[in-house]
């Protein structure tokens, strides 16, 4: 049912989100013309004096979180826009590391609704404009924008980044971004700007990224060429044209993303002390990214949902001391590379607890089992989680993975039970 009545600034956030979901004829409608027009009317095309924009198949969230952590340690006032959220919509906008109240979001939506006139906006475009408006109100020093999909035609690209970052390139969203790494690389490099640093964390960079950098006159800085890092069992070293940083603490986020964030920061020209770098890297953490929630049994949340992320997750699982079995609670979207993702995880998982995800994009438990050959199917993520936890012994590991939605469902179940729900 389409909701025609426009919510007001004082309307609940849930009412606004329901309205936004039904506002535009298409869920994804790549292109910058509509959203740029509304942004100009709102005066949010320059949300802060300095902007980082971060694209990439995987690693965007933790790269943004590391940048945020270091910049805050250095005393900057920082805003971060990221997506999707895990449990609450308000997770998408952080100012000084904190979510804003729902009333701030609804106030921003009312401003956008007033400014857009007859211009139709997607849910993501609306959310992006909202973040930019909130950042402008907060009078920040630095804003970090996480690209939603691709780069060139993503709503975040209406803002000219002072530093553009591409974390990694792998096959995902091929319906929108193209069938191969070269096409995807070209789309993601669309965030590059003339005479501005363009940081690439992907070690096997598609040539199209260099092509776009040359076309735009961007200052390309590639991992393994202009900057690099090396890791030992107990610390890591980073080097670039500015020099070498040694004895860095191993990060809690994936190592390549911490290094990419550091490369972007050092290319930015922003003044940041070595102590702030060390403190920021040590404290950066992001929920749902190899998040060890508890022990006995060990419970790990990871939103890995494509082969590239599953390969990394598999490596992390193999590095853990293993005593018992690994029980995986998994739900996926059917438009992801299910076979490729599961092929990696099979080598570290002993028992599968498969669950369907809701909505038109959700894969059924049976679709997952087709690729696994063995495992149990359940009617919901909550049921799969309960069964895995009931079966797990103290020495076992329960891994929740496959999608943001899967991890979010389990987080919601845990939160509800903690607060006295069922």
Describe the predicted segments one by one.
Residues 1-27:
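Charged, amphipathic alpha-helical linker segments immediately N-terminal to NTP-binding catalytic cores
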Residues 12, 26-28, 32-49, 73-159, ...:
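ATP-dependent carboxylate-amine ligase catalytic core
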Residues 48-50, 137, 142-147, 154-165, ...:
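Nucleotide phosphate-binding/pyrophosphate-handling subdomain across enzymes
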Residues 50-54, 62-79:
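A conserved segment at the C-terminal end of the G1
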Residues 81-84, 200-202, 214-231, 248-252, ...:
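Beta-strand->loop->alpha-helix junctions that form or flank phosphate-binding loops
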Residues 88, 127-176, 207-244:
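Extended acidic/charged loop-beta regions that coordinate divalent cations
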Residues 185-193:
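Membrane-proximal helix-turn-helix segments that form the acceptor-binding/catalytic region
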Residues 199, 203-221, 230-235, 266, ...:
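C-terminal helical cap/extension that packs against the catalytic core
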């Amino acid at each position: 049912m389409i909701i025609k009545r426009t919510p007001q600034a004082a309307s609940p956030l849930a009412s606004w989100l329901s309205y936004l979901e039904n506002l535009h004829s298409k869920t994804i409608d790549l292109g910058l013309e509509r959203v740029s027009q509304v942004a100009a009317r709102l005066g949010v095309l320059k949300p802060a004096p300095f902007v980082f924009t971060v694209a990439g198949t995987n690693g965007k969230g933790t790269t943004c979180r590391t940048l945020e952590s270091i910049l805050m340690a250095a005393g900057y006032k920082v805003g971060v826009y990221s997506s999707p959220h895990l449990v609450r919509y308000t997770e998408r906008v952080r100012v000084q590391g904190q979510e804003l109240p729902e009333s701030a979001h609804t106030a921003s939506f009312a401003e956008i609704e007033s400014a857009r006139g007859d211009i139709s906006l997607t849910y993501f475009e609306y959310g992006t404009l909202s973040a930019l408006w909130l950042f402008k109100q907060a009078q920040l020093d630095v804003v970090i924008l996480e690209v939603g999909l691709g780069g060139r035609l993503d709503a975040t690209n209406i803002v000219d980044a002072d530093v553009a970052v591409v974390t990694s390139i792998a096959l995902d969203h091929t319906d929108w971004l193209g069938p191969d790494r070269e096409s995807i690389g070209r789309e993601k490099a669309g965030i590059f700007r003339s005479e501005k640093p363009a940081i690439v964390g992907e070690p096997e960079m598609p040539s199209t990224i260099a092509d776009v950098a040359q076309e735009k006159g961007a200052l390309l800085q590639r991992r393994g060429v202009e900057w690099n890092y090396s890791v030992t069992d107990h610390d890591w070293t980073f080097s670039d044209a500015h020099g070498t940083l040694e004895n860095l603490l191993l990060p809690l986020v994936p190592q390549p993303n911490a290094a990419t964030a550091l490369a972007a920061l050092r290319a930015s020209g922003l003044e940041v002390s070595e102590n702030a770098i060390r403190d920021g890297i040590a404290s950066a953490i992001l929920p749902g990214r190899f998040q060890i929630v508890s022990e006995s049994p060990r419970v790990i949340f990871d939103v890995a949902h494509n082969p590239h992320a599953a390969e990394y997750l598999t490596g992390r699982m193999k590095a853990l001391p293993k005593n018992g079995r690994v029980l995986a609670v998994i739900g996926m979207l059917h438009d992801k590379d299910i076979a490729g993702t599961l092929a990696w995880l099979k080598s570290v998982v002993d028992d599968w607890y498969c669950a369907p995800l809701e909505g038109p994009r959700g894969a059924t438990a049976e679709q997952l089992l087709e690729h696994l050959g063995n495992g149990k199917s359940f009617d919901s993520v909550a049921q799969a989680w309960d069964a895995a936890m009931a079966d797990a012994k103290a020495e076992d590991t329960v891994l929740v993975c496959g999608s943001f939605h899967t991890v979010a469902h389990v987080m919601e179940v845990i939160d509800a039970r903690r607060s006295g729900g069922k």
